[in-house]
Every structure is written in C-alpha cells, then in structure tokens.
Amino acid sequence: MSAKKIVLKSSDGESFEVEEAVALESQTIAHMVEDDCVDNGVPLPNVTSKILAKVIEYCKRHVEAAASKAEAVEGAATSDDDLKAWDADFMKIDQATLFELILAANYLNIKNLLDLTCQTVADMIKGKTPEEIRTTFNIKNDFTPEEEEEVRRENQWAFE
C-alpha cells in the first residue's frame, strides 16, 4: 500500500503532491489533516511555488533522515552529522529566498525550519557593527546622529 498523498497548492496556482508524512512536518497542515480539511488540496496563499518547493525539499529530507535514524540506531551520530551538513548546504541561498523561507516556515509552523533560517540570519549579524549590518541587509540609516547616539547609550551593554 502506498503512503497517503496530500496536495499542496501554492499562491501562484501550482500544485505539489507530497506524502502525508512530509506534509505533517507543518503543524499548520497537521491541524488541517486532523480537522479533515485536506481532501480538495491545501491552499497556501502565503507561499509561492518556488518557496513551497524548497520547504518540501527540506521536509522530505528531514522525514527521510528520521526514518533512517529509526532503522539504524548505531549510525545515528553519522546521520545527524550528515543532516547538519545537508542543512548548511540547504541554507546557501540568496537573502530574498532566505527571508521568504522564514515567512513560510512561520506561516506553516515548521519549527525546525524556522529555527534553521533564523539562526542563519543571526549568524549573518553576529560580530558585525550596525553599519556592517545595514550594508549586509541593504538597510537605510534613517537615524539622526543624535538619535543614533541615544540608542548607543541606552544599549551600551550590547556594544561591550
């Protein structure tokens, strides 16, 4: 017997047929399955097909890793390392895609993907000056020098 399939529909009208186990990585979709609301497909108005394909790729890999870990307990450390390496490679994406993935992971309530994407942004910020952060994320400085100084004084602990 084949695994049950669920159809996910992106905001731009593309449909993706995925195994239920993969779709259940999303708590949002899991609740819809519990409520028996997936027979005609799951519309995801906040997720484009490009991002949904990435989300599905991530969920598939993590479901496969969990299944292989359950089968072979001895090699578990190796599979964890492999998954971490895969995650690191998966995060080698442009900023726009990264930010869209964060929004999708949040909307779909996929905690591990949200943690991974947010950690990636945190790593991009770590150890940088405010000016370097602005450059990295293309943020315009709209503070006056006085306002900037006031923020530095109020948050002195963060600059130590």
UniProtKB/Swiss-Prot annotation:
Tissue-specificity statement: Accumulates only in meristematic cells. Expressed in inflorescence, shoot and root apical meristems, as well as in developing organs such as gametocytes and seeds. Also detected in cortical layer and epidermis of roots, leaves, pith and vascular bundle of young stem, young floral buds and organ primordia, pollen and through the valve of siliques. Not detectable in mature root tissues.
Compartments, record wording: Nucleus; Cytoplasm, Cytoskeleton, Spindle; Cytoplasm, Cytoskeleton, Phragmoplast
Main location: nucleus
Keyword Ribonucleoprotein tagged: no
Transmembrane regions: none
This protein's pathway: Protein modification; protein ubiquitination
Taxonomy, superkingdom: Eukaryota
Gene3D superfamilies in the cross-refs: Potassium Channel Kv1.1, Chain A
GO CC, alphabetical: cytosol; mitochondrion; nucleus; phragmoplast; SCF ubiquitin ligase complex; spindle
Interaction with the F-box domain of F-box proteins: region residues: 102-160
CDD domains: BTB_POZ_SKP1
Any one of the GO BP annotations: response to jasmonic acid
Keyword Nucleus: yes
Role played: Involved in ubiquitination and subsequent proteasomal degradation of target proteins. Together with CUL1, RBX1 and a F-box protein, it forms a SCF E3 ubiquitin ligase complex. The functional specificity of this complex depends on the type of F-box protein. In the SCF complex, it serves as an adapter that links the F-box protein to CUL1. SCF(UFO) is required for vegetative and floral organ development as well as for male gametogenesis. SCF(TIR1) is involved in auxin signaling pathway. SCF(COI1) regulates responses to jasmonates.
Subunit structure: Part of a SCF E3 ubiquitin ligase complex composed of SKP1, CUL1, RBX1 (RBX1A or RBX1B) and F-box proteins.
UniProt similarity note: Belongs to the SKP1 family.
Name listed for the protein in its UniProt record: SKP1-like protein 1A
